[in-house]
């Protein structure tokens, strides 16, 4: 759903909002902690578990793996789930306005200490898994994890786990004794290791040089034992493992290294999640400075998960921290990403994380960080704050960006910026669901508006720390009146006076000033703000959030197919739960009509799957191509494009697992279904179809498969 309107715009926040945190009694269904499909109303706080708080010293590793002073940042420092529970219960997180936490991968990691260039390294970070069905004892037990879930939910905080199914742990093909040989366990039972891999659980194609997407998927990431997702044992194991964590009550998943796993397998993984217990899921696909990445957008639009918005993070750092771009560049990024992502509001924004240098430098002006936080918290998308950012932590690359949090002060300006703005995501639907418009801009100043129905929020930012800005000619969607700065002048903001037609009186925005103004009003007509999940099979219940649906059941439309009655399992003014009807697989627009027949806006690009999904590798031999031609796959199911060359799967690969003129691609297809398919060559708008009759293949009911055929001239 495109939500950046390419015209001048501004955020307006009205006086009608009370600025306290929502209590459980006040929470609308769409803003509730029980809403696992929608994080648009949430603020995520990313916690590197080992570096946050040591609540139970008894579970700390012993010997050379542990440094209680946290001087050696490659060793365990003692943070655990009990420490997070303590900071939930003492009000540090709730007081900041945090409504979701993203914690380190909770699974059991290797115990070996690995010496790299004379420096000891441990699995403190959680990314060196050995058993995806057990916990990391340095973080806590299963009971401790359940206590964390319960404590978080009691304080209206959702829990997201990091999950890294790309690999296990460091391994060497030449030295079976290196570390733990990448060994994989199933709840304590050994499945296999990297050497003597008779079951083919892992890839053995060498290390990636990152030169192509294919190279990054089917070769090892550094020295990490790369899991073979086309292996049925690996596939079923990983899908069973995530179901275990879903059963433990998690509310979301952050998928590590999605650029480095087969896209078809990941779509089948998301189908398994959505068909079981759907939760908000977002992946990590790194983008560098000024990198746009069409494959990144395609993945976000078609995989069933959203992404960490590195494009956003890199541009915000350029504009607010490094001064290497200006507000016009920031605006162009916002408009570009809104056009490229089908559901831009589901992408997760941030200004720093564990894979980047900290935003704040030790001697830098703190106002830069404070402005970046304010900008991020009010924008469309789901904001995530890296632990310690509110304490102005600094640090370069890994591991210096992963130090222990120095304090839990609630008096820093950064903490208070978050505290004042985070609650608005639940109290003003313009911030959670609204369109975005630029209203006033020059090199240093951006004023933008979020609007949803009659709800408005306006943000003004002057990044010039030395010169005030004279603002004239500003027009907003705010009703006539006077609006106080929601930040209360914390960042030198001012009151805004608005006359008839939304015209604001001229004013001066202070040097380094940031102000937020808002207005809220009831929404009389049905307006959809969010749908989740955005991909599932018929019969799965999805959640539609917004405003103005009314209290009596109406009708939900998937394209022209109407759903009513018992197939709508819940209908409230801000939320509808509905079962996907028995329609053919494909892309559908969703809309709602209330009991009186008044129709809502259209929410587009919902994918109905043809059924349960499995990952199948399609291989075609001896398909020669001319320079500039690529090979694609299509067939008689929507997952293969329904014979439409424009929707065909590809371009296929031909370098790593199979080599030219043989091609391959891993695709998510309906389980147990007999599929007809063909290959085709594309070069620009020119399409050359494979000859002969259609190939046929029956997909397995579970696990994975490979279908290998010859090109038919």
From Swiss-Prot:
Residues 526-607 form the IPT/TIG domain. Residues 608-713 form the CBM20 domain. One of its GO terms (molecular function) is metal ion binding. It holds the Pfam family CBM_20. Keywords: Calcium, Glycosyltransferase, Metal-binding, Secreted, Signal, Transferase. Its EC number is 2.4.1.19. The active site is at 256 (nucleophile), 284 (proton donor). GO terms for cellular component: extracellular region. Ca(2+) 2 binds at residues 166, 217, 226, 260. It catalyses: Cyclizes part of a (1->4)-alpha-D-glucan chain by formation of a (1->4)-alpha-D-glucosidic bond. Substrate binds at residues 127-128, 167, 220-223, 254, 259-260, 354, 398, 402. It is found in: Secreted. Its cofactor is Ca(2+). Ca(2+) 1 binds at residues 54, 56, 59-60, 78, 80. Residues 1-27 form the signal peptide. The record marks 355 as: Transition state stabilizer. This endo-type adsorbable amylase is capable to digest raw starch. Belongs to the glycosyl hydrolase 13 family. This is Cyclomaltodextrin glucanotransferase. It comes from Bacillus sp. (strain B1018). The lineage of its organism: Bacteria, Bacillati, Bacillota, Bacilli, Bacillales.
């Amino acid at each position: 759903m495109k939500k950046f309107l390419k015209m001048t715009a501004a955020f307006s926040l009205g006086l009608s909002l009370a600025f306290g945190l929502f209590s459980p009694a006040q929470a609308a269904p769409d803003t509730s902690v029980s809403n696992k499909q929608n994080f648009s109303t949430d603020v995520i706080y990313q916690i590197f578990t080992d570096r946050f708080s040591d609540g139970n010293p008894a579970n700390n590793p012993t010997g050379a793996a542990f440094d209680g002073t946290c001087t050696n940042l490659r060793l365990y420092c003692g943070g655990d789930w009990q420490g997070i529970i303590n900071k939930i219960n003492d009000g540090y997180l709730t007081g900041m306005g945090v409504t979701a936490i993203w914690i380190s991968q909770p699974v059991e990691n290797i115990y070996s200490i690995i010496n790299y260039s004379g420096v000891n390294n441990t699995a403190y970070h959680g990314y060196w898994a050995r058993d995806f069905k057990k916990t990391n004892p340095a973080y806590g037990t299963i009971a401790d994890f359940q206590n964390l879930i319960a404590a978080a939910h009691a304080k209206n905080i959702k829990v997201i786990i990091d999950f890294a199914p790309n690999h296990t742990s460091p391994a060497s093909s030449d030295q079976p004794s290196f570390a733990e040989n990448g060994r994989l366990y199933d709840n304590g039972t050994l499945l296999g290791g990297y050497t003597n891999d008779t079951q083919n659980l892992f890839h053995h194609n060498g290390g990636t040089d990152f030169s192509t997407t294919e190279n990054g998927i089917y070769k090892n990431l550094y020295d990490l034992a790369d899991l073979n997702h086309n292996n049925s044992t690996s596939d079923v194991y990983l899908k069973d493992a995530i179901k275990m964590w879903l059963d433990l009550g998690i509310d979301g998943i952050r998928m590590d290294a999605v650029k480095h796993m087969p896209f078809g397998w990941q779509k089948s993984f998301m189908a398994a999640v959505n068909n079981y217990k759907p939760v908000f899921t977002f992946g990590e696909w790194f983008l560098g400075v000024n990198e746009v990445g069409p494959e990144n957008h395609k993945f976000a639009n078609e995989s069933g998960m959203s992404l960490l918005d590195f494009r956003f993070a890199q541009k915000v750092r350029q504009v607010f921290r490094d001064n290497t771009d200006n507000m016009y560049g920031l605006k162009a990024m916002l408009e570009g990403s809104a056009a490229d992502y089908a559901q831009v509001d589901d992408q997760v924004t941030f200004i720093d994380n564990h894979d980047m240098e900290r935003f704040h430098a030790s001697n830098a002006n703190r106002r830069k960080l404070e402005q970046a936080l304010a900008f991020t918290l009010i924008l469309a998308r789901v904001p995530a704050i890296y632990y310690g950012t509110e304490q102005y932590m600094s640090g370069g690359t890994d591991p210096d960006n992963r130090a222990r949090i120095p304090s839990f002060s609630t008096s820093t300006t950064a903490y208070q910026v978050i505290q004042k703005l985070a609650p608005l995501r639940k109290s003003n639907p313009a911030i959670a669901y609204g369109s975005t418009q630029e209203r006033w801009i020059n090199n240093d100043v951006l004023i933008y508006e979020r609007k949803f129905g009659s709800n408005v929020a306006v943000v003004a930012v002057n990044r010039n720390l030395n010169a005030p800005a004279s603002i004239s000619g500003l027009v907003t969607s705010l009703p006539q009146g006077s609006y106080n700065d929601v930040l209360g002048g914390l960042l030198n903001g001012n009151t805004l006076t608005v006359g008839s037609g939304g015209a604001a009186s001229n004013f001066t925005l202070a040097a380094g000033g940031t102000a937020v103004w808002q207005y809220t009003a009831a929404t009389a007509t049905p307006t959809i703000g969010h749908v989740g999940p955005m991909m599932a099979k018929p019969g799965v219940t999805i959640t539609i959030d917004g405003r103005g649906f009314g209290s009596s059941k109406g009708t939900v439309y998937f394209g022209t197919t109407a759903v009513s009655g018992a197939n709508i399992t819940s209908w409230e003014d801000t939320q509808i739960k509905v079962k996907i009807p028995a329609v053919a697989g494909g892309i559908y627009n969703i809309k709602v009509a209330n009991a009186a027949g008044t129709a809502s806006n259209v929410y587009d690009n919902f994918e109905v799957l043809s059924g349960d999904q499995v990952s199948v590798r399609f291989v075609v031999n001896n398909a020669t191509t001319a320079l500039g031609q690529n090979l694609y796959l299509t067939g008689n199911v929507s997952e293969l494009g329904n014979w439409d060359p424009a929707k065909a799967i590809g371009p296929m690969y031909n370098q790593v697992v199979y080599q030219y003129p043989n091609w391959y691609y891993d695709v998510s297809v309906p389980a147990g279904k007999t599929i007809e398919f063909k290959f085709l060559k594309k070069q620009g708008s020119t399409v050359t179809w494979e000859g002969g009759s259609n190939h046929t293949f029956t997909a397995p009911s579970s696990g994975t498969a490979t279908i290998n055929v010859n090109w038919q001239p």
